[in-house]
C-alpha cells in the first residue's frame, strides 16, 4: 500500500506541474529565407514603387526633403519642422532623402519579421500560425505604408524585440530576465516614431500589469518596471542630449507632441470626414472583429492580458487620427499595425498537443510500472 501511495503522490505532483509551471521548450527554427523574401517584397511595394511613380505622401515627401536640406544648412527642429524622432532624421540626412533609405527599411522589416516570429512561437507554440502572422504583417505594411509611414517601419524591429521578451515572460513567468533590454529597445524605437512607441510601451505595460495582478507577481512587477526604466534611460539621455547641446530640446519636444497637442473635437472641421474615412478603412482591415475577439473571447491569461491592452491601443490610435486636423491620408493608418498584429497574435489558439502527449507518456510509464509491481506482489 505504501508503494501505491507513493506512486499516486508522484503522479498527482507531476500532473500539477504540467498545468501550473510551463516547461520551457526549444523554439521553432526561424524561417529566415521566407522572411527575407517577404520583407523585400513589402519594401518594394511600400517604398520603391511610390518613389518611382511619384506617389509618396506629402508628409513623407517633406521628411525626405528635410534630409536633403540638412546637408545645405541648419539644424533639425530649430530650422526644420519635424514630428518624428531624431534617429529617423539622421538616416534621412545620411541618405539625403533618396531612395537608398529603402535599404535600411528592408533591414528593419526583416528584423521585425524575425522578432515577431519569435514572439508568436514563444507565446502560443504554433510554428505555422507564427509564419502566417509574419506574412500578414508584411501584407499590412505593403498596403498601409504605400508611400508613407516610414518612421514607424524603422521602429518595428525594436518594438517587436521588446514584445518577444515580454511574451517570453508571459509564457514562462519564472523567466523574467531581459527587461533592461526592453527599455533600451523602446528607447531606440522612440527616436524613430515617438508617439506610436509611447502607445506601444503603454500597451505592453498594461498587459504585464494585468498578468502580474492576476498571478500575484507584485515583486516581479516592481523589478520589471525599474529594469525597463533603467534600460530606457541608458539610451534616452545620451541620444536626447544632442538636442540639448544644439539648443533644440524645447523645439524637439513641442514638435514631437504637435500631433497630440493639435487634437480637437469641437473646432475640428474635418471630424466627420476623418471618422468616416479612418473607421471604414479600419473596419475593412478587420479591426472590428479583432477588437471584439480581443475584448470578449475566452483565452489563456497570458494572451488575454495583452489582447485587452492591444484593443485599447487600436482605439487610442484611431481616436488620434479622427481628432487630428491633418489632411486625410491612408498612410497615416500605419500607426495601428503594431496593435493589429498584437490582436492577431493573442487570437491564436495555444498548441497544447505537446504537453498533452507528454502527460500521456508519463501516465503510460506509471501504469506499466504499476503492472510490474502487481506481478511481483
Regions found by a protein language model. Give the residues of each.
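Perimembrane helix-loop-helix junctions
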Residues: 199-233
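Short acidic/glycine- and proline-prone juxtamembrane loop motifs at membrane-interface regions
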Residues: 145-155
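Short hydrophobic alpha-helices at membrane interfaces in multi-pass membrane enzymes
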Residues: 166-188, 218-222, 226, 308-312
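Transmembrane-helix signature of polytopic, membrane-embedded enzymes
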Residues: 113-143
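Membrane-interface transmembrane helices that cradle and orient dolichyl/undecaprenyl
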Residues: 160-181, 290-301, 348
Amino acid at each position: 500500500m505504501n508503494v501505491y501511495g507513493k506512486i499516486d503522490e508522484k503522479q498527482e505532483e507531476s500532473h500539477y506541474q504540467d498545468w501550473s509551471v510551463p516547461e520551457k521548450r526549444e523554439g521553432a527554427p526561424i524561417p529566415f529565407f521566407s522572411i527575407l523574401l517577404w520583407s523585400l517584397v513589402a519594401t518594394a511595394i511600400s517604398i520603391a514603387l511610390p518613389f518611382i511613380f511619384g506617389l509618396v505622401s506629402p508628409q513623407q515627401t517633406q521628411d525626405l526633403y528635410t534630409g536633403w536640406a540638412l546637408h545645405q544648412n541648419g539644424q533639425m527642429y530649430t530650422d526644420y519642422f519635424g514630428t518624428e524622432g531624431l534617429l529617423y532624421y539622421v538616416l534621412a540626412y545620411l541618405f539625403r532623402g533618396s531612395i537608398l533609405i529603402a535599404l535600411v527599411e528592408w533591414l528593419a522589416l526583416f528584423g521585425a519579421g524575425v522578432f515577431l516570429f519569435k514572439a508568436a512561437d514563444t507565446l502560443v507554440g504554433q510554428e505555422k500560425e507564427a509564419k502566417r502572422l509574419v506574412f500578414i504583417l508584411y501584407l499590412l505594411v505593403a498596403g498601409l505604408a504605400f508611400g508613407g509611414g516610414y518612421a514607424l517601419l524603422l521602429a518595428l524591429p525594436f518594438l517587436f524585440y521588446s514584445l518577444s521578451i515580454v511574451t517570453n515572460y508571459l509564457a514562462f513567468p519564472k523567466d523574467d530576465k531581459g527587461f533592461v533590454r526592453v527599455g533600451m529597445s523602446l528607447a531606440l524605437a522612440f527616436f524613430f516614431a515617438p508617439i506610436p512607441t509611447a502607445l506601444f510601451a503603454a500597451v505592453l505595460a498594461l498587459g504585464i500589469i494585468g498578468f502580474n495582478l492576476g498571478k500575484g507577481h507584485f515583486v516581479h512587477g516592481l523589478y520589471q518596471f525599474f529594469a525597463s526604466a533603467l534600460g530606457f534611460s541608458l539610451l534616452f539621455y545620451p541620444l536626447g542630449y544632442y538636442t540639448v547641446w544644439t539648443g533644440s530640446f524645447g523645439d524637439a519636444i513641442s514638435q514631437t507632441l504637435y500631433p497630440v497637442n493639435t487634437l480637437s473635437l469641437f473646432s475640428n472641421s474635418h471630424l466627420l470626414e476623418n471618422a468616416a474615412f479612418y473607421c471604414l478603412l479600419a473596419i475593412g482591415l478587420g479591426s472590428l472583429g479583432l477588437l471584439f475577439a480581443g475584448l470578449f473571447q475566452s483565452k489563456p491569461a497570458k494572451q488575454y492580458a495583452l489582447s485587452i491592452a492591444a484593443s485599447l491601443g487600436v482605439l487610442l490610435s484611431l481616436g488620434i487620427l479622427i481628432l487630428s486636423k491633418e489632411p486625410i491620408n491612408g498612410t497615416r493608418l500605419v500607426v495601428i499595425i503594431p496593435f493589429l498584429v498584437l490582436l492577431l497574435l493573442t487570437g491564436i489558439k495555444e498548441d497544447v498537443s505537446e504537453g498533452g502527449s507528454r502527460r500521456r507518456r508519463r501516465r503510460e510509464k506509471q501504469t506499466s510500472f504499476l503492472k510490474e509491481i502487481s506481478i511481483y506482489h
